[in-house]
Amino acid sequence: MGRNSEKTEVRKMMYDVVSLGEFIIDFTPYSNPENKIVFEQKPGGAPCNLAAGVAKLGKKAAFIGKVGKDMFGDVCIETLEQAGIDTKGVVMTDACNTTLAFVKLLPSGDRRFSFYRNPGADMMLAFDEVDLSLIDNTKIFHFGSVSMTHEPARTATMEAAKYAKSKGKIISYDPNLRESLWPDLGTAKDVMLEAMQYADIVKISHEELEFLTGLTDLDQGSKLLMEQYGIKMMTITLAADGAYGRVGDNTVKLGAYDVKTI
């Protein structure tokens, strides 16, 4: 390949990260002066939050997903644009509404979710609606498991990850377990594990590691998944205890510092 062709290939990589998955509206509580619970509208969804983080770091990000043609879908699009995230891959539909999630903050700092998603627009993304040119033009492709709870989004997510793998992309995967969204936990485990075959990088919680492997030991659980699926890097979040990281046989554990849950 000549020098001009090499320059063309580099120039075609328009994005650092393209993220696919759910984009929803979280309603988070706070107390007003009368001590009544008030819910504040906040666009969210783990894959979209990741894209926002990438953009805040000064890198180029794009998002692939589906929202409703409603006021919440409009907020989602506006939020992406304000964050500097490419919205070319976002599909809008009038067949169903944007998914909503009401959040309860627990004394431990953890969160509990109540979802209004029956169905939600994010569940209805079909593979033929996925803009593959975005995947062609990225260095890293990221996806999670919430978009795989139901069809057609399950197939769309799996096929997009498979396509990214075939194109030699670095693939990041977040097996994010939300039990109430799955038909049953057996299906959740099977689907979440099936997607591991595409991952180079996995971010997982210690509860999710135990759910998928039956192991509570971080060394054993991470080694099992990484060897079985060829994963190159794994980060395990440990809530208040920090995080654990593994690359090959090299491991590290870092403590957490106090933060206010928001």
Model-identified regions with their sequence ranges:
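Conserved N-terminal subdomain of the carbohydrate kinase-like
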Residues: 60-143
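Conserved beta-alpha-beta core of the PfkB/ribokinase-like small-molecule kinase fold
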Residues: 146-224, 231-232, 241-243
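Glycine-rich phosphate/pyrophosphate-binding beta-alpha loops
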Residues: 26, 99, 145-149
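Short, electropositive alpha-helical surface patch
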Residues: 73-85, 189-197, 221-222, 226, ...
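Glycine-rich phosphate/adenosyl-contacting loop at the front of the ribokinase-like
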Residues: 2-86, 260-262
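Conserved phosphate-binding/catalytic region of the ribokinase-like
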Residues: 2-3, 7-16, 162-163, 218-262
